[in-house]
């Protein structure tokens, strides 16, 4: 399989040697959706990676620009040039978004925020690494009736392995998807195709792929950790490849957090570590008896707990996110930390002892409906604020908080994550100073405005369960 280009020259050679006819220019919008424009490959030359392509109408992208300042430029990132293996003679490349007219980088380009975060941490003498675990569902079909909301809305999920399936084959019972072998696991072949494509064409190193806890085709793919912007790029690629391979098979992949009631939702647990530039893990202390965690590591946790409610608006950014973040489904609800407690927002993995390179934290609230460029940048900034202010995270909580009395939770001063998107947005609106060295006011305000509009719109529609519950009122 073709190797990934390392520079502009190799990217141009890549187009020639692979007989590429079309190139997909891809970028991420403010809400985390991957967008694209396709151009002829013969438009690429030596200047393309310096001048870019004036192809984007920014007024057509939510949260970008208005119609009177809509001309924008997409600047290709040569190291991201790859084949699209399910299309003949087509390549794709990720791009940076610039204002037209030579006015510089577009301040609401999410990838630009990730680059600013990397620059900011470098100025502080740090390097960070991120390793997200992406969960998702692959359904056979989803029927949605929302075109005439006045007469009612609804949806139906078809899944060959779900308890409600009528296919006559094996089913996976609720919460028993972790880890039955095939043929009970009926989606191993599609996961293998996804991870093989990621490795062969997109430069991934895969660490694991497996069925997840939920029925109806829930899976997880874990790839090797990397630096902030590169990891966010890989999240977008993984979602893109997964959706396309499912679609090619006549199925549908979704990264929404909670597509149906009664089973676990999909998260994006994010592993994070902070290092010096000369390769020392700042979170590791072999003399710490509890978790081999350093004082700096505790300060990072303190920052994440301090700003956890505000972070929710970025890491759990949809109304559906808060149907996942409820007790009973292995999702975090409480802003505490622990060595192995999966009801806590922050977990310190304890697979190994005495291994500096493996010391990290796992931040559990994020889900894959989020914008990874903003998520990883916000996690970094909260952690750095914890270091700067020496925020004490308090003692770890190792018992199941779901079973803890309200009185005990109050005595331990345990705070909960927001219970809704509205609540999370209010928290972000009042607590965002820690983000401002990297998140400019333009992107913060645009994000808040878009998400408030989204939350308000969702509140207008009666829910099918409301009909069930209140029809006899």
UniProtKB/Swiss-Prot annotation:
PROSITE patterns, sorted: GLNA_1 (PS00180), GLNA_ATP (PS00181), GS_BETA_GRASP (PS51986), GS_CATALYTIC (PS51987)
Binding-site residues for ATP, renumbered to this chain: 207, 271-273, 342, 347, 357
The protein's Enzyme Commission number: 6.3.1.2
Chain residues that bind L-glutamate: 264-265, 324, 330, 342, 364
Influence of temperature on activity: Optimum temperature is 90 degrees Celsius. In the absence of magnesium or manganese ions about 50% of the activity is lost within 100 minutes at 78 degrees Celsius, whereas more than 95% of the activity is retained in presence of 4 mM manganese ions. Magnesium ions are a less effective.
ATP-binding found in the keyword field: yes
Location(s), subcellular: Cytoplasm
Protein name per the record: Glutamine synthetase
Provenance organism: Sulfolobus acidocaldarius (strain ATCC 33909 / DSM 639 / JCM 8929 / NBRC 15157 / NCIMB 11770)
Upper classification of the organism: Archaea, Thermoproteota, Thermoprotei, Sulfolobales, Sulfolobaceae
